[in-house]
């Protein structure tokens, strides 16, 4: 599950709620300083599970088709 983020909030919550495992950054959109903040936010958080797990299970079922 990849995510394309242009700010730290999205990076944090796509990790926490969507269990994203790949982070994509636009080279022309994100400068070096912001890129470091986004990467830190992505790496500093883990998947919360719980109510979000249902969505992940649905995605995994689609991947298996």
Predicted regions and their residues:
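Short hydrophobic/aromatic-enriched beta-strand-loop microsegments
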Residues: 1-7
């Amino acid at each position: 599950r990849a995510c394309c983020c242009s700010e730290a909030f999205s990076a944090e919550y796509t990790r926490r709620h969507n269990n994203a495992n790949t982070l994509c950054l636009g080279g022309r959109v994100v400068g070096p300083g912001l890129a470091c903040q986004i990467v830190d936010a992505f790496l500093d958080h883990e998947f919360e599970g719980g109510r979000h797990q249902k969505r992940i299970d649905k995605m995994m079922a689609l991947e298996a088709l």
